[in-house]
């Protein structure tokens, strides 16, 4: 549920932190857009993307097999998925709805009529001998996604703002293929619904390519269209690169944002080098192996897919009002939410705002908490205290354990931060109510820590630690921290450490 956030919230050991830092540094050095790379003014860079996105449906696009393709190999397949004769496809309406949500979110023109075509090729991961896709009449066309100040790229480079916008050529609904592991094929993935989002070649920098992919991930997660993960293959990106209007080169097998950066840099340099040596470029498909792009096929031996309409599937005929109806049913857009959450009265950090957008349950929790707390530190209480408490205990965030109104009451209590953390930890660890935690930890009104109680505790500790007291009075003032530690342990964090520190210094007559 909140794994992406909680995984990064838990405290790490010093050695793990050092290892992570070294790894991050090495990765940054390898994947940095700027490192040892530049575009040459005389060789204009153009780029477009083809983004394959798995839709979050319970069943496959044309069968009732489940979409859990990471389970035991070939455990979620039907006769249709493996192309056995006598089986016919039946369109999953949930997949159509999610595809339409994506089309509306990307500002596309939803087509009143679309239909499916067969894309013929022979490969072990496609047992039917063809893929069902939408080549001639896609579901949606002519969309766009616009960059803004939240995307981390330079924008507004032309008066009409054209360079701020990436045009979407089309969105087509299609089925995924099986997955090949050496000589073995797993067909669990075969038939999972996909949308292919094809952009125009509007990218003039690698920064914009990355910004678009991240913005797209945020969008599909927020609208619950797809998990948005590149590492699991839920989103797969093919990159089209060309220089000076030469024939485009399609790069496949790209699985991370780092690979996107490095594949583009390598391919751009390869094309520039070819041209500077007097060579010519041809339309190609190339595979990325993590270091370089390798020729898969050229225009001369390109596959003729022999597209033709799928006679077993009817046309999709939609109401003229469908786009408007879906748009009005969607929640607030990511850009609108970011603008609202990063401005007054919330004033959230951009990273925190983006985390909220990708986790609807957490967003609802934060807004419910803020409606009661209504102070600038609301995000700190949620992110730095609440979520960290769950993460440190290795637990998944559960709103039922600490409801927003209960958390707001805890935050408003007349207790120091250490005491509030102690109560929160007790609630999460033992799954008890706030009242029960207060009672079990001794924070009831008649048990509340007072200055008089703190003074008495200090006197008691001084009397029972004469050796440490003698050391302090002989000039080793830092030894007072031992007494402070004993007092904190005795009171289980009911007082701030500074309270005891000041009292010990006062009672021992040291500065």
UniProtKB/Swiss-Prot annotation:
Molecular-function GO term, any one: glutaminyl-tRNA synthase (glutamine-hydrolyzing) activity
Coiled-coil features, chain-numbered ranges: none
Compartments reported by the entry: Mitochondrion
Transit pept. (range): 1-6
GO biological process terms, semicolon-separated: glutaminyl-tRNAGln biosynthesis via transamidation; mitochondrial translation
GO cellular component, one term: glutamyl-tRNA(Gln) amidotransferase complex
Enzyme class: ligase
Main location, first listed in the record: mitochondrion
Entry's EC annotation: 6.3.5.-
Pfam families linked to this entry: GatB_N (PF02934), GatB_Yqey (PF02637)
Free-text function comment from the UniProt entry: Allows the formation of correctly charged Gln-tRNA(Gln) through the transamidation of misacylated Glu-tRNA(Gln) in the mitochondria. The reaction takes place in the presence of glutamine and ATP through an activated gamma-phospho-Glu-tRNA(Gln).
Subunit text: Subunit of the heterotrimeric GatFAB amidotransferase (AdT) complex, composed of A, B and F subunits.
Family: Belongs to the GatB/GatE family. GatB subfamily.
The name this protein goes by in its record: Glutamyl-tRNA(Gln) amidotransferase subunit B, mitochondrial
The species this protein was found in: Lodderomyces elongisporus (strain ATCC 11503 / CBS 2605 / JCM 1781 / NBRC 1676 / NRRL YB-4239)
Lineage, uppermost ranks: Eukaryota, Fungi, Dikarya, Ascomycota, Saccharomycotina
């Amino acid at each position: 549920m909140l794994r992406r956030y909680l995984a990064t919230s838990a405290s790490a050991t010093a050695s793990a932190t050092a290892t992570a830092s070294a790894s991050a540094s090495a990765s940054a050095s390898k994947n940095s857009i700027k490192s040892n790379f530049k575009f040459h003014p005389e060789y204009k860079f153009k780029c477009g993307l083809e983004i394959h996105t798995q839709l979050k449906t319970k069943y496959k696009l044309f069968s009732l097999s489940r979409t859990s393709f990471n389970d035991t190999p070939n455990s979620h397949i039907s006769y249709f998925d493996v192309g056995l004769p006598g089986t016919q496809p039946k369109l999953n309406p949930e997949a159509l709805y999610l595809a339409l949500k994506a089309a509306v979110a990307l500002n596309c023109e939803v087509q009143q009529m679309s239909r499916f075509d067969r894309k013929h090729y022979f490969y072990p991961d496609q047992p039917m001998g063809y893929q069902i896709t939408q080549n001639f009449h896609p579901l949606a066309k002519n969309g766009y996604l616009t960059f803004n100040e939240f995307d981390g790229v330079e924008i507004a480079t032309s008066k009409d703002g054209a360079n701020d916008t990436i045009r979407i050529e089309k969105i087509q609904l299609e089925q995924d293929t099986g997955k090949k592991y050496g000589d073995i094929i797993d067909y669990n993935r075969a038939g999972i619904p996909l949308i292919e989002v094809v952009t125009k070649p509007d990218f003039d920098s690698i920064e914009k390519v990355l910004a678009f992919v991240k913005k797209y991930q945020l969008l599909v997660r927020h609208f619950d269209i797809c998990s948005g993960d590149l590492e699991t293959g839920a989103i797969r990106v093919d990159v089209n690169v060309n220089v000076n209007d030469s024939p485009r080169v399609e790069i496949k097998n790209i699985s991370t944002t780092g690979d996107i950066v490095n594949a583009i840099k390598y391919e751009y340099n390869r094309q520039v080098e070819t041209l500077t040596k007097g060579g010519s470029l041809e339309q190609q498909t190339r595979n990325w192996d993590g270091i370089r792009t390798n020729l898969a096929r050229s225009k001369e031996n390109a596959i003729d897919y022999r597209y033709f309409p799928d006679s077993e599937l009817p046309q999709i005929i939609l109401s003229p009002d469908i786009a408007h109806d879906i748009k009005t049913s969607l929640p607030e857009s990511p850009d609108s939410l970011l603008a609202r959450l990063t401005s007054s009265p919330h004033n959230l950090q951009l990273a925190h705002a983006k985390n909220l957008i990708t986790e609807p349950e957490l967003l609802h929790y934060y807004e419910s908490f803020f409606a009661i707390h209504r102070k600038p530190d609301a995000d700190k209480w949620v992110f730095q205290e609440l979520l960290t408490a769950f993460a440190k205990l290795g637990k998944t965030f559960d709103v039922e354990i600490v409801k927003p109104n209960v958390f707001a009451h805890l935050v408003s209590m007349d207790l120091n931060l250490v005491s509030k953390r102690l109560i929160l930890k007790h609630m999460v660890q033992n799954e008890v109510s706030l009242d029960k935690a207060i009672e079990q930890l001794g924070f009831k009104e008649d048990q509340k820590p007072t200055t008089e109680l703190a003074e008495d505790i200090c006197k008691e500790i001084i009397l029972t630690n004469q050796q440490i007291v003698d050391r302090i009075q002989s000039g080793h003032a830092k030894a007072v921290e031992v007494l402070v530690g004993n007092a904190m342990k005795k009171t289980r964090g009911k007082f701030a450490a500074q309270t005891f520190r000041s009292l010990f210094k006062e009672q021992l007559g040291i500065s």
